Each structure stands twice: as structure tokens, then as C-alpha cells.
């Protein structure tokens, strides 16, 4: 992964100030589609298709990405229209949704791929039709996408790996429950974690007892994997590197059945209310906070710039990413932050990302 630069915290704040915080959403079924915005594309500046991957790996897509993206587009260009679809974890469905969006006249596709490799076909079809593609959150592999908006995903894994390194006793056994192998981000998270932990595994400071990828990031798959790890290791587990909060919840469930919850460090990612609740309870140790509203707002800014035929500002596009296409992809890369019980107030609460009421009573 080739990242030339990463957005600093200060620049992220500047972007956040430039892009007003999203303030509204349009209701929709989680399995359906939604059309939001001002005039239709025939009367306005054009249509942006927002294609998100699922509703199971994280609650963020319905509760944050979709409403925040839509609100920002509406603010920046009230005449633009946002067509929203969720693939519910099916790559073929996402392909069909993309083709329909192109047929219906979308000028920009903002795609968070179900399958990073399969989604290359979406880029090919869009390119033939003169439609621009922004790869959102997850990178589409080996395809000439126009822009990429995400976080420094290897850094996410490094933060998780460093937490495990700092909080696991010498000689301790580590379990790694990674994300979906079809997700380029999951590969980056795992690589970042291994960059930190492999030297410790090699010199015997720590032991890697079990590692697996989790199909579709599905928490039920994660539960089975953690149960298998505990069985294989006879419950001799000293730390669990879990790729996100959804999987962390499954890890905690498996640990609880063996009376180990709260005794074993468990990592997470996404700063979900459930994950933060578990952190407050002491059963999850940390999460990696990614300011999703900022990510959605940045993607909206890029999409609107494309609709208007404007080149995005160099203050916005701050790096490049190698996705195997042979061409560096212009990228906006935001910085992730570790959240523990000690700094919840200074991070997710201070930013308005969530509230203690939601954390104490997650849905």
C-alpha cells in the first residue's frame, strides 16, 4: 500500500469546519433504495448514486454514512439528487444496482464495495458510460477509480496491534479475528497489525495461537471462529485482536461462555455504541474511532465537485493510493484514533459522534 501523505488531525479539523456537520436524513428501509435531494437530474445539476455494502457488518451505513452524505450533498448543491442503494452483502446485487444507476443517468457513483475485486466490473461499466467513480471507505481493487476516500487503514491495524503488544503478558497467546478476505480494507488492517506483531511473534515475546478471516464480516461467523479458537487453545488465550466492534461483540460472547470476558484484552474498530458500551463495562478494551461524518462529508464534496466539473482542492485530496491498477489513485486519507474508557469523553463525545446516553443504552 503506497500512501504518500496522510491527513493530519489539524487538516481533518479544517475539513470538518469547511464541511458543515450533517444535520438530517431521509427515512428508508434498510433493504430498499432511497432517493433524496432537490430536483431530478433533468432539472438539477445531476444524480449521485451512493452504493453501500450491507447493514450487518456495522450500523454506521444506515445511521451515519447515508444520512450524513445525503445532507452534505443537499447543502452543497440543493439541485443535485442522491440515489441510495444497499447491497445487503451481495456483490451481484451491488453490480445490478450500479448498472441501474448508470442506466438511470447517474453522473457519479460513490461505491463502498461488498467485494473489492468483483467491484472492478462496476468501474469498467461506469468508465464506458463516462460516469466517475469514487471508491468509498473500502478500495476497489485493480480498477482505475477516480478518487478514494477512507482512513489510513494500515494505521488502523497498527493501532490495534500496538494495543495488543502493550497489554499482553510476555509469552502470551494472541488470537486474531480478521475481517472479510474479500474486503481490501480488511487486508490492510491485518497487514498493519502484523507489521507490529510479527516481530514479537518471531522473537517469542508473544505467540500467535489462531488467526482467521471472517466471511462477510458476519458476527455469527466471528462467534464460531472465536469458539473454535478457544477449543483449539484449551481456553489459553491472553489477548484477542478483533478487527471491528461487531466481531468484538462475538468474541466477548464466546469469552463470556468460558468466564473469560473482561480478563482478556479485546480490540475493536468503528466506535459503535455497542462497542463503546462494552468498553465502559470492561469487556472490550479499545476501539479505533473513525470519524464517519467527516468521511461522508468529504465524499459528498468530491462528488459535488465532479458534478460541477470542478477539480477538487489540493487541500482536500491529500495523497494517493495504490490499488493495483497501475495508476496511483488520488485519495483523501483521514486519521484514525484509539478510544479507551479513559478518553471517551475527549474523543467521540467531544466530537458529537455519539452521546453517553446512547452508549449506556445502545440499540
Give the location of each predicted region.
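A residue-level marker of the well-folded mature domains of exported/periplasmic proteins
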Residues: 2-10, 22-363
Amino acid at each position: 500500500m503506497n500512501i504518500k501523505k496522510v491527513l493530519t488531525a489539524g487538516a481533518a479539523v479544517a475539513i470538518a469546519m469547511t464541511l458543515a456537520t450533517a444535520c438530517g436524513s431521509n427515512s428508508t428501509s434498510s433493504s430498499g433504495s432511497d432517493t433524496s435531494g432537490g430536483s431530478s437530474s433533468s432539472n438539477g445539476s445531476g444524480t449521485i448514486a451512493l452504493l453501500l455494502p450491507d447493514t450487518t457488518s456495522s450500523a454506521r451505513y444506515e445511521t451515519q454514512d447515508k444520512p450524513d452524505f445525503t445532507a452534505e450533498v443537499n447543502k452543497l448543491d440543493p439541485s443535485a439528487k442522491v440515489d441510495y442503494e444497499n447491497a445487503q452483502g451481495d456483490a451481484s446485487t451491488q453490480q445490478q444496482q450500479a448498472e441501474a444507476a448508470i442506466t438511470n443517468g447517474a453522473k457519479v457513483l460513490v461505491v463502498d464495495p461488498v467485494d473489492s475485486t468483483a467491484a472492478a466490473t462496476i468501474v469498467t461499466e461506469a468508465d464506458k458510460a463516462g460516469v466517475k467513480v469514487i471508491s468509498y471507505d473500502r478500495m476497489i481493487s485493480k480498477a482505475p477509480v477516480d478518487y478514494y476516500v477512507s482512513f489510513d487503514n494500515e494505521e488502523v491495524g497498527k493501532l490495534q496491534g500496538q494495543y495488543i503488544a502493550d497489554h499482553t503478558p510476555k509469552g502470551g497467546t494472541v488470537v486474531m479475528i480478521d475481517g472479510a478476505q474479500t474486503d481490501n480494507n480488511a487486508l490492510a488492517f491485518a497487514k498493519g497489525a502484523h507489521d507490529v506483531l510479527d516481530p514479537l511473534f518471531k522473537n517469542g515475546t508473544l505467540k500467535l495461537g489462531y488467526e482467521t478471516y471472517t466471511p462477510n464480516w458476519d458476527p455469527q461467523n466471528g462467534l464460531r471462529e472465536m469458539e473454535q479458537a478457544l477449543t483449539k487453545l484449551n481456553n489459553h488465550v491472553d489477548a484477542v485482536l478483533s478487527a471491528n466492534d461487531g466481531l468484538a461483540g462475538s468474541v466477548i460472547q464466546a469469552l463470556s461462555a468460558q468466564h473469560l470476558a473482561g480478563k482478556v484484552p479485546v480490540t475493536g474498530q468503528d466506535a459503535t455504541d455497542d462497542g463503546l458500551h462494552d468498553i465502559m463495562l470492561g469487556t472490550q478494551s479499545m476501539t479505533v474511532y473513525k470519524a464517519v461524518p467527516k468521511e461522508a462529508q468529504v465524499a459528498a464534496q468530491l462528488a459535488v465537485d465532479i458534478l460541477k466539473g470542478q477539480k477538487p482542492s489540493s487541500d482536500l485530496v491529500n495523497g494517493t493510493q495504490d490499488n493495483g491498477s497501475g495508476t496511483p489513485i488520488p485519495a483523501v486519507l483521514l486519521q484514525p484514533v484509539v478510544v479507551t474508557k479513559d478518553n471517551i469523553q475527549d474523543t467521540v463525545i467531544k466530537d458529537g459522534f455519539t452521546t453517553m446516553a446512547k452508549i449506556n443504552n445502545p440499540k
